[in-house]
């Protein structure tokens, strides 16, 4: 079993099981009652294992549960764009798996149709990232691309606006129409969105701050902007069915 095929954590495993992505659940012997475990037992085969075996196969805080996943479908960007998405998220240089997972979770909660990740200069979809996403990574269509700049150009050719989160941006999110098809581009904590990516985006959106710290972290900023997308779309009646 490869690391990429294994996830851990009760919420992440449960969401993957609800989506029909789980082959088998490994559950440590002696766990107390939890309704999530009851639901898991109805959704997927359970193998009760000694706690030390679970420690050996599941790194990190696993909460007594790990799962083997079915192979994740690999989407190309062309296939993703053929689904006529109204909301995409592109991640430019997100190297921390916790940030990666948190952004994917926010994207799925906000109704995103998919995510675009670079093949290089990105944290992998590791068990830690999947756990941080609470299983959202197993629900989203995810396309890996050779480079974000060329991907942005392709997204724009499909008629989708590209909006970069940028601390030096000139536009507040509520001053931009986020009800139209849009791809939100999120950069890394230190560097932000890279220059060539920024230049190819249609608009740079800035989240105003009132404190002494200059910016939100990447996952918090993404969550705030994705919430604004959802707020505008609910107000216009254009949320995804």
Enumerate the language-model features and the residues they cover:
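Short secondary-structure boundary segments
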Residues: 10, 29, 93, 119, ...
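N-terminal positively charged helical leader segments and presequences
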Residues: 1-82, 241
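Short, ordered loop/turn segments at secondary-structure junctions
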Residues: 30-31, 51-54, 120-122, 147, ...
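Active-site/ligand-binding-proximal alpha/beta "capping" segment
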Residues: 163-217
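RNA substrate-binding interface of SAM-dependent RNA methyltransferases
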Residues: 83-171
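Structured adenosyl-cofactor binding patch, chiefly the S-adenosyl-L-methionine
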Residues: 14, 19, 109, 131-136, ...
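Short basic, glycine-rich beta-strand/loop surfaces that mediate nucleic-acid
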Residues: 59-70, 133-136, 179-187
């Amino acid at each position: 079993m490869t690391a990429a095929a294994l996830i851990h954590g009760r919420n992440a495993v449960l969401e993957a099981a609800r989506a029909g992505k789980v082959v088998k659940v490994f559950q440590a012997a002696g766990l107390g009652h939890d309704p999530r475990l009851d639901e898991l037992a109805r959704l997927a085969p359970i193998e009760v294992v000694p706690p030390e075996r679970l420690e050996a196969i599941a790194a990190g805080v696993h909460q007594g549960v790990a799962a083997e996943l079915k192979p994740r479908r690999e989407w190309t960007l062309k296939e993703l764009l053929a689904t006529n998405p109204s909301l995409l998220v592109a991640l430019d240089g997100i190297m921390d798996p916790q940030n990666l997972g948190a952004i994917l979770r926010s994207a799925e909660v906000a109704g995103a149709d998919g995510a675009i990740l670079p093949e290089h200069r990105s944290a992998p979809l590791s068990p830690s990232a999947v756990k941080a996403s609470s299983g959202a990574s197993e629900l989203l269509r995810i396309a890996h691309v050779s480079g974000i700049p060329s991907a942005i150009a392709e997204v724009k050719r499909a008629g989708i606006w590209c909006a970069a989160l940028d601390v030096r941006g000139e536009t507040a999110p509520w001053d931009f129409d986020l009800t139209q098809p849009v791809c939100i581009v999120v950069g890394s904590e230190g560097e932000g969105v890279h220059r060539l990516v920024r230049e190819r985006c249609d608009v740079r959106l800035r989240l105003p701050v009132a404190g002494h710290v200059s910016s939100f972290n990447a996952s918090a900023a993404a969550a705030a902007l994705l919430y604004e997308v959802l707020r505008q779309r609910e107000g216009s009646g254009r949320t995804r069915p």
